[in-house]
Every structure is written in structure tokens, then in C-alpha cells.
Amino acid sequence: MKKETELNLLTNENLKTFILAGNSFFTVLNEITGNRFTFRVRKAGWGTSNVKSNIFYVSVLTGSDNESSYVFLGSFFSDKGFYNHSLKSKISSSATSNKVVDWFFQSYFNNPNHFNMIKVYHSGKCGKCGKKLTTPESIKSGLGPYCGGRN
């Protein structure tokens, strides 16, 4: 990854808050293999009055447009800590991207200190509202001052 992306490295302390903020984009990198996948995690009902607090839709980047080339994989249930691949997904449950996100939520998400070879980077935009991050605190956490509750 480019040197400047080190600024977007999520710490273990900020990881869960950022990913479950409601509209997060992040890249999971395995430094040993060099494999990486970019995911979007969006809270169910986001942008409506029907927001469900514990259901998150997971999509993977499949094309060259980093904003819109995402394909739905499945759902993460934050209250149970459980990821489920959806039968409605156009991507097979045996696809590497699905295996990575399943492993991410089942193993890494709750024990990131045990996997030093894995790095998680945010996209440089707030994981909740999507605005560009500009303050040092926001860049570190992945959440803007308002969304991160610092103002």
C-alpha cells in the first residue's frame, strides 16, 4: 500500500466503532500474502426511519469504481457477532472474498491483537456520514468530529 495510507490504518481500539458506524468502507490487507479486499458495511435501513441497530449489510469491491462497484455478500448481526452469507448474493459462499469477510467477523473482529499480519485501513471518509476526514483525530478514528462525538 502507498505510504500515505498508513495514516488511514485503523487501530484495534477504533476498529469496531468505525466498522459499525453505519456506512464504512475499509480494506483488509494480509501483509504476508499481499492479498487485500475492500468492503463496505452499511447499517440496515441506513438513510431511512427504519434503521435496524444490529443488522449490517456487507459488500465487496469488485470493479474499478471505489464508490459504487460493490456487490452484496451477506449480513453481519452485531448483537450475535455473527456473519451470514446471503443466498441472494451474486458471489458464491466459496469465493475468497466471502471467506475473508467471514473470517474477519468470526475471528479477527473480536481478537485483532492475535493477528499482527492483518492491517485494516479506512477509506479516508467518515464511516458514518461519508465526509472527507481532515482533522488528525478524525483520520485516526475513521469518524468525523461530529459523528465521533468529539464536538
Predicted features and spans:
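Non-membrane alpha-helical secondary structure
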Residues: 7, 92-97
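Compositionally biased, intrinsically disordered low-complexity regions
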Residues: 36, 47-49, 65, 76, ...
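Glycine-centered flexibility motif
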Residues: 22-24, 74, 142-144
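A short, sequence-level motif marking secondary-structure junctions
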Residues: 42-46, 77-78, 140-141
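Cys/His-clustered metal-coordination modules, chiefly Zn-binding fingers
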Residues: 95-151
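General detector of N-terminal leader/presequence modules that precede the first folded domain
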Residues: 1-57
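Intrinsically disordered, low-complexity regulatory segments enriched in Ser/Thr/Pro
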Residues: 51-89
